[in-house]
Amino acid sequence: MADKLPYKAILARKEGMTQAFDEKGNVVPVTMLKAGPCVVMQVKTKESDGYHALQVGFLDQKPARLNKPQRVEAEKRKVAAKKHVQEIRLDGPSDRKVGDELKCDEFAAGDVIDVVGHAKGRGFVGVMVAWNFKHKPRSRGNMNMRGPGSIGMRAYPGRVLKGKRMATHWGGERITSKNHRVVAVQPDQGTLLVSGSVPGTDDGIVFVRTARSKRPFAKA
């Protein structure tokens, strides 16, 4: 292929965690990712779009859940509409065409990758959970042991300063977990075994890409 991908990339579904043995016989906790197949939905070029990219889709969408623009676009490209669509930037033109598939064998055992996903939502939490505050003295007369205490001042500037650590929503954010190692690739099952835990719930969708960091090691 003539692709000049800055990194390998694919969409995957998190299946859960298990354990595997590495080449040295050590037990390694791994996350099983159902990677692909991702179908190329669109090929963008610098001439028509201003940059080179592949738009890939993952998991078929029910026709009844498509709006008219999505249905017309899928019919025009002659590919099935997908639930999840992701764009992969390229450094140069690609030989891939609409309808081609990206599978888990894009990666190999030993590759170092980043995994992008959404962390589990933990709901609304107070300052002791969110910021590791100490509780107030549990002595006679104190009715607010888990509260944040003072959050500002009186006369000047007379407001709560930006960045004040207070009760907040915890989790549910887009997270990039860096420098995982691909322990094994299982093309017959379409899965990747990735060292350690990755963001999100089981059955959640994650974006797997070659690690951008220059650090020479990967998570065990």
Where are these regions (language model features)?
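Extended basic (Lys/Arg/His-rich) segments that typically form rRNA-contacting surfaces
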Residues: M1-A220
